[in-house]
Amino acid sequence: MKIKHYPGKAVDASLSLEGSSAMGALYEANWLRAANQPAAPATTGTKLSRQSSSAGSSFLIEGISALSKYQMTLENIRQLELQSRDKRIASTIKELSGYRPSALQHHQQQQMHNVWVAEDQDQEHEELEDASEGKEKLASIQEPPAVNHYVLDPTERPRVPRPRQQFSVKPPSLRRSQTMSQPPSYATLRSPPKIKENLSKSSSAYSTFSSAAEDSQDQVVICQQPQRLMAPPPREPPPEPPKRVSKPLSRSQTSVQRYATVRMPNQTTSFSRSVVRSRDSTASQRRLSLEQAIEGLKLEGEKAVRQKSPQISPAASSNGSSKDLNGEGFCIPRPRLIVPVHTYARRRRTGNLKEQSSGGQEEEAEKGKGWKDFYVLSQDRHSSFYINRIGQNYDYDYPINFNIFSPDGRVEVSREGKYLSTLSGAKVLGELAILYNCQRTATITAITECNLWAIERQCFQTIMMRTGLIRQAEYSDFLKSVPIFKDLAEDTLIKISDVLEETHYQRGDYIVRQGARGDTFFIISKGKVRVTIKQQDTQEEKFIRMLGKGDFFGEKALQGDDLRTANIICESADGVSCLVIDRETFNQLISNLDEIKHRYDDEGAMERRKINEEFRDINLTDLRVIATLGVGGFGRVELVQTNGDSSRSFALKQMKKSQIVETRQQQHIMSEKEIMGEANCQFIVKLFKTFKDKKYLYMLMESCLGGELWTILRDKGNFDDSTTRFYTACVVEAFDYLHSRNIIYRDLKPENLLLNERGYVKLVDFGFAKKLQTGRKTWTFCGTPEYVAPEVILNRGHDISADYWSLGVLMFELLTGTPPFTGSDPMRTYNIILKGIDAIEFPRNITRNASNLIKKLCRDNPAERLGYQRGGISEIQKHKWFDGFYWWGLQNCTLEPPIKPAVKSVVDTTNFDDYPPDPEGPPPDDVTGWDKDF
């Protein structure tokens, strides 16, 4: 989608229009006319008579656009010009919140403007009577004559000539965010007279505006420099002059279309001149269609000067929308706010970074979030960036492209009114927009004419998701055709497909040479290869056969036989592409994982039934609140006890239903309840029972009064090797339990690790946990920026391997006190993550074995991460860094923890911060019924 933005200062939330905007001048003129000259409002359309019958009749209905009070469409603006004495305009504009045209501040200095001025009637009649003489005169000033003539409607008010004013070539002083450049789509003259060489005269500017779609005849279209109009004093209408009939010029007087650009000091003013050589009598045959115009743009897009000027077809004009000379839709000038403001603090924000408003619905092909009927500046979010028309919301990433009229397209970056930098050329703006929804960090203002190529977030993510799924399915089908792979499980095939690397060979290249040693296996994905064998007696290569797409070779190398028995030569003229996997990677992935996956199948079933039986009769009214343990995104966590039992306490998590619905987190809440309700692991916080009412959802959970691991890390600065090893081992055990059930956690960080009274760590907050189908991936962008894996950022799909990445990040943070990937804002953090763990300098206090484990966990390729390979998570437990660690004692909770928190009683909350009561009060009721199964 190609979006055209026009230069000018960024518009604030009150929609005060700048003087460099032609539409701003129109608003101002209409506002002043309506306020000073009351008249009866028109309720019917005004018919514009034309000479040509092929053009048809055009009706413009007066009124204000109902789609938004902040802008009027071009057709309505033109109607207001025809019905200039409409009292309702003033009252309508006054209703706009905070709207006051900036020209009401009567500036003493009038901005420079270029308008075509009508000559004396006698001169024009003289010119039209003598066509050949007119042609010579026009040629002398290098300006083509008009072809779009018509008979004036007697019901129309004639234009009142105004005193001509000279303008200086020197433009007024410009601020950094202003420009004097203007694209050729703001104004068109309906009845242009003879054109003088002197362009420094003014007339009743903007009172003769007309759209290309309304003028069905060929026309001279002129690009004017927008100006700030000063309101003329009220005057009596003069008597109507006699009707004037313009004579059409002959074909011999027309010239070929061309563009010209006039450069002035400190500004760029483009004038578009076009005259079509007519070869047919009908207007439809003389005009280029919109499709031809677009095709012409594609062919001529790289040229500095275009050779043809496309016109708009009648079909296009029938839609009621105006088109400019470039074949693009006429757009009312819009704000150019592009980039977001991200609230960033050490208390890291975790969330569904893909779409805060949607709650990250985990469907693999999420639909758009709809649109809201308000102007973009009232919300200033990426998810509601105004692009095409009022009422549509898009999520865009903006690379700047060069403009044919302005090769030096530039934008200005500012924050809170302070200038930061100027960008030009092939720069990218709004990178975060295609990842997730967040507030803008800066203001981007077009200071020259720019062409922007935009991509919508949902479109980008859908393309990435579908491309990944198609590639995965294609690679899996290739593997199933190989005898040594056909009996492997589906998830194993998917793992192998993830590590296949595509390599390319040119015609004549030897992919494999007979007698050479190799450990790689090949699958042909494109092209053909020739198989030959060198005969020992003649040393000549004997042709064996041809192999094509889907065929494979080198399979014996995976089984240990590394001596090549034939030559494989690229035969296709376009080259050959092969999918390659080496023996080491293959052996790491291929194993019998059934024992690991089913280790916990029958464990804890009896204990879960016992818990359900014990808490079956407990009601919400049986609980009394002792203190507040924490405050979350949807509510609070309270320390509670049951009536009549002071020997134990629980954590009651209460979540506001209305806020859950507002942020569309229903699916995540239901998933959290399901996963925690089925879990029975001593390294995961237990869920005992759930409640609900009209306002809240409640989760009665195990209380961990030792506090957050983050609090201890903050106080100590960092942990030593032994302490880090213990807490990492607790997380490994929790991941072992979850991953054996194909559950991905996706929110690991010290803030989500709670210590119980003994000092053992437990995972809490399963809001982003998800149960995956075997061998499948998910595409939701969620988590904490410092812990997000590269495949999540790149939208390639992720699975449990993303948890192993975050485990390596956690190890680094526990050993040093800070995560390895940290930037001043999320985008900088993501860029550091994409550079990889090898670009990170490890402090000296990290031992060699710890560094080795972190780097193996944080591999860029998910399939190469330790824990995701052949031995599963046991490969982590067997790593040298864990040598001598008492895993059996940890699993049975007999191992002494390195830090034992001070907990005096079951209601001791000294390890938690103090929290005030909820200042917002009770939320509104929610009776939609989405939580019936909670």
UniProtKB/Swiss-Prot annotation:
Q: Which residues form the AGC-kinase C-terminal domain?
A: 883-934
Report the leader peptide range: none
Residues annotated as binding 3',5'-cyclic GMP 2? 545, 554-557, 564-565
Query: Which PROSITE patterns does the UniProt entry name for this protein?
Result: AGC_KINASE_CTER, CNMP_BINDING_1, CNMP_BINDING_2, CNMP_BINDING_3, PROTEIN_KINASE_ATP, PROTEIN_KINASE_DOM, PROTEIN_KINASE_ST
Residue ranges of every copy of the Protein kinase domain listed in the record: 623-882
Q: Write out the biased-composition intervals (Acidic residues).
A: 121-131
**Where in the sequence does UniProt note compositional bias of the Polar residues kind?**
175-185, 218-227, 249-258, 308-324
Single GO term (MF) = ATP binding
Keywords (alphabetical) are:
ATP-binding, cGMP, cGMP-binding, Kinase, Nucleotide-binding, Serine/threonine-protein kinase, Transferase
- Assigned EC number: 2.7.11.12
**One GO process term, biological-process aspect:** larval feeding behavior
**Which InterPro entries does this one have?**
AGC-kinase_C (IPR000961), cGMP_dep_kinase (IPR002374), cNMP-bd_CS (IPR018488), cNMP-bd_dom (IPR000595), cNMP-bd_dom_sf (IPR018490), Kinase-like_dom_sf (IPR011009), Prot_kinase_dom (IPR000719), Protein_kinase_ATP_BS (IPR017441)
Q: Which residues bind ATP?
A: 629-637, 653
Q: Which reaction does it catalyse?
A: L-seryl-[protein] + ATP = O-phospho-L-seryl-[protein] + ADP + H(+); L-threonyl-[protein] + ATP = O-phospho-L-threonyl-[protein] + ADP + H(+)
SMART domains named among the record's database cross-references: cNMP, S_TK_X, S_TKc
Low complexity bias spans: 200-213
Active-site residues from the entry: 747 (proton acceptor)
According to the UniProt record, where is the region Disordered?
Answer: 121-287, 301-327, 910-934
Recorded GO cellular component terms are: cytoplasm; cytosol; plasma membrane
Entry's family note: Belongs to the protein kinase superfamily. AGC Ser/Thr protein kinase family. cGMP subfamily.
Q: PANTHER family, alphabetically?
A: CYCLIC NUCLEOTIDE-DEPENDENT PROTEIN KINASE (PTHR24353), PTHR24353:SF111
In Swiss-Prot or TrEMBL terms, this protein is called cGMP-dependent protein kinase, isozyme 2 forms cD5/T2
Q: Which organism is it from?
A: Drosophila melanogaster
